[in-house]
Amino acid sequence: MDGNHFHVIVHDLAGALAWFARVWAAEPVYRGEGMAVLRFGPILLILDQDEEETVTTIGYATADCDADFRTVVGRGAHAIEEPADRSWGVRAAYLKGPGRITLELEQALDANARSSDSAT
């Protein structure tokens, strides 16, 4: 598994984007309503705006979400959500980390897998 993103909740999205632009010269590679994605080499930083700054998510890219999920749960990780296909084209599972950290295992689904899933 390789780390591929951090997902952070911020109170002031515009302020956070201005800070990353000023300090790191980082511009969003994606901007949606109340959220933005910045790229730092192979790592994505996902910023979501919310009133409470609560949870940080660390995402790991995996070739086999189900197998890696079983491995880390077998090592004592606590599951939040078991592996499932997500609408954004990945198979993902969520685990409870220390403090307010959530860990996400994310496996890219190819277009053929998504097409066959939606056909059934």
Residue ranges and their predicted role:
Residues 1-17, 44, 56-60, 109-120:
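N-terminal beta-strand motif that seeds the catalytic metal site of vicinal oxygen chelate
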Residues 3-11, 36-39, 50-120, ...:
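Vicinal oxygen chelate
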Residues 5, 9, 13-37:
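N-terminal first-folded block
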Residues 18, 51-52, 79-80:
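General secondary-structure edge motif
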Residues 25-56, 102-109:
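Conserved short beta-strand elements that form part of the metal-binding/catalytic scaffold
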Residues 46, 66-68, 113:
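Residue-level signal for secondary-structure boundary sites
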